[in-house]
Amino acid sequence: MAQQLSLFGSPEPEETPAAPALAAAPAKPEPAPEPIVAYASVVLDIPTRALSEPFAYGIPESLANEAQVGSTVLVHFGNRAAAGYIVDIAPELDDLQGNNALDPARIKAIEAILSKSLFTAEAARIARWMSREYVATLSECLRLFLPPGGSPRVVKGDDGAWSVERPAVKPIQNRWVMLTPEGFDYTPPKTAVRQRQLIETLQCGPVMTRDLNLLYNSMSATIKALEKRGVVVVEERRAWRGCSEQTTLSSASGKAPVSLTNGQQRALAQIERARLDAHGDVVLVDGVTGSGKTEVYLSAIERVLAAGRSACVLVPEISLTAQTVGRFRSRFGETVAVFHSRLSAGERLDQWDMVSSGAARVVVGARSALFCPLSDLGLIIIDEEHEASYKQGSSPRYHAREVAAEMARRYRCPLVLGSATPSAESLDRCRRGTYGGATWTRVEMPERPGHAVLPTVRIADLRREFAHGSRSMFSKPLVEGLERVVERREKAVLLHNRRGFAPFLMCRECGCVPTCNHCSTALTYHERTHTLQCHTCGSSWRVEPYPAPTSRCPKCGSRYLAKMGLGTQQIEDALHQMLPDDVAIIRMDADSTRGKDAHKKLLEQFDAADCAVLLGTQMIAKGLDFPEVTLVGVVNADFALKLPDFRAGERAYDLLEQVAGRAGRGDRPGEVIIQTYLPDDPVIRAVAEHDRSIFTDYDLDQRRDALYSPFVRLSNILVWSTNADDARDYIGRIAKLLKRRWHAAAPDFLRAGSAVPQVLGPASCVIERAKDRYRFHLLVKSPVGYHVSDDIDACLKEAGSVRGVSVSVDVDAYDLM
């Protein structure tokens, strides 16, 4: 419910004739302003580039005890009310950070404190670093540190009045009933059956009133009667939602092994060395799939907790399965808080409060878990550090690895990066030895624990299959592999990185591919709902493809609008036709995992099955550990190889290597069958031969020649508008300003032995139109170590703003589409 404010007075009433008066009432004197006892830097919760810097406000005497760094406050700004966040407090105006010799007489006072402190002074400093590093507003960066649901906001209503909106998500208090010491000796009358039932139930411990009422069809009157007698006591306790996630998965145990492998021991020793040195150093754990990286994390966390500090573990959202969470909770119990998108808003708030209160000392979560209010942070772990999902897609477009490295430096704790396919950037920094003031060390873990070995990889050349007359989506080797799985009652995993039934429809007469009316992207066909769906904006259209009699091409009217390519739904249908009925076929993609706990339930179904095939998109490639899986099949490995993105090969290699690692993790040997039309591609060869260098040597040569990361920093400036000309003109203006700036500074770069930053473009984006907005971008290549953000920010300020045109900056960009 919004709380109405009277900040600027009520509207003047219409004049009415004054009633006769005997004498004029004396005018009420204006109250004297409160004395200002301190000053605060306040960042307004208005995310515009022009208002990014803090503003100085006075702290009146009445608010002096409440005002803290991290508090949300209500202030006047111009002719409006605004919420803001205190990021600094000083007794004198001259001592305030960012003060530009302001006149104390002109400083306005803070009107009210809207919330307690929600972040620390160190968090405010990290947010300021992020704001500068990623050319984002400071308020956007501070919001990352706020609790789920946010903080109070000031909004303008339809009537023009300003009001405070409080977060809708609130804590829940449960009422618990328990016996008093006297209650254990109390004997109820023989006729008091319900009292006896209640006392017998409470002998085992406290019970919620809600559960008692359900169990005994309302116990309220009995509880009140015994409470008056002093037999029971009722108290309110905070409910911690999000802690009850249970799983039947057999591999969710975090029980420590009897012994560690040599690789695990080396990794743990290096992490311990970095912890004791306390310089914020980085350890890259480069371990093959199934090498036991999670056990290294668990053992390192045990040592950190024993030292009285806390730990943060980041896992890609796609890998944050019940298996992963179960391992941490089985080892550390209720001290683990979990954050992921499948939690409700209330569950996220309770997990955040568990961390804030100190009840949780270990956080496991996706990218945003990095900003949880852990006290005395002693270790940061980023699992699957190569994952592109660690790069935020909206402003502030930070990379979790870079922010974590900055946090590790400030908190003087180690940062551990783990992956079977480390990113080119992390490997390059380990080769250099130092980066950003920290030491970067790589530790290899080449072996799997026990007797498990890496799977055998076979390549199914689809060119030969086609030449021999096969038109099936499954090659002969893959069919034979699935038959062996069924015969031995084992399990298989099939990867196909396209959801839906068919990637697109195409007219066989004119070649038209239906595209979204609002975006320049082809529509995906979904057989279950008979719809074409846009996976960019979510729009959908009902359609009946050929051979339905109602099938019609939107361009030429032909009825030969046919399904082209493969989707997971189509492969699922083919598997049902090919395999016996007693083989469970389980599909996991964005469509089948929409519901709450759907992801966990599908994995539990796969785990419990006697013989099963798990078919899915990239979400099945990581974070899964099923010893019964002996076969992994890749239906089409070529889809991601030739995308117009210099990281396409790296992403394809990561995906194939990761999914291949799902096979042979138990006592039984594993087999991987990769179907491809490009068997000689370095990505395919590297996976097949278990030799990363086949791909990385080729890939790094290509990047070095073309000047791409890790040899330069790559920034993407994106402009969009419903008016294509306005967007094109605006990005052209930005490009000219950048080129002019660096042309003038070229002698300075050359004297320093550094390359001059380059501007490529502007040009239309690969997806030229999305949600009815035309998109243009330019790329900036700058030397590694050069702080290009300051130059970009200065040019954006000089370019000004254009009504209806939006701009975003992606420093160290991952997505160039």
What name fits each language-model region?
Residues Y39, Q68-V69, V583, F606, ...:
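A short, contiguous, amphipathic alpha-helix enriched in charged residues
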Residues L750-S754, Q758-K771, S808-M817:
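Short proline/glycine- and acidic-rich turn/helix-capping motifs at secondary-structure junctions
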Residues R728-L760:
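Short amphipathic alpha-helix segments
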Residues D45, E200, R704-S709, C765-K771:
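Short, flexible, solvent-exposed loop/turn segments with mixed acidic/basic and small polar residues
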Residues S693-I694, L700-D701, L738-K739, A744, ...:
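Surface-exposed amphipathic alpha-helical segments in non-transmembrane regions
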